[in-house]
């Protein structure tokens, strides 16, 4: 697997970059956590339920920093239920645990 820096960092933008791979892993992990907390809460998720993670990268005076925007698509639920499950999933997701206090992470739910 060959990686390339994103255009934002002077790369060609072709192929995969570490941020893309990180977002794919985070999204898959968060979806698993979401399904777990839904099951434990006796909430049935629709098959169309999905998670997208957008990873941002920026530079400060001395280094680079990441940020993550996690968007859950939970079409079978109310907005309140969806937001509650997203919050619970964020507490148990291993990627969220690993990034907590290290990068800015936001979550949102769409129904």
At which residue positions do the language-model features occur?
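Extended beta-strand/beta-hairpin segments
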Residues: 1-24, 31-111
């Amino acid at each position: 697997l060959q990686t390339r820096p994103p255009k934002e960092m002077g790369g060609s933008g072709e192929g995969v970059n570490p941020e893309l791979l990180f977002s794919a892993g985070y999204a898959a992990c968060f979806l698993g956590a979401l399904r777990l907390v839904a099951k434990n809460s006796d909430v049935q998720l629709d098959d169309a339920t999905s998670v997208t993670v957008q990873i941002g990268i920026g530079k400060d005076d001395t280094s680079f920093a990441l940020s993550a925007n996690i968007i859950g698509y939970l079409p079978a639920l109310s907005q309140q239920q969806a937001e509650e499950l997203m919050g619970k999933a964020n507490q148990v997701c291993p990627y969220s645990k690993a990034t907590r206090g290290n990068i800015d992470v936001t979550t949102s739910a769409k129904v």
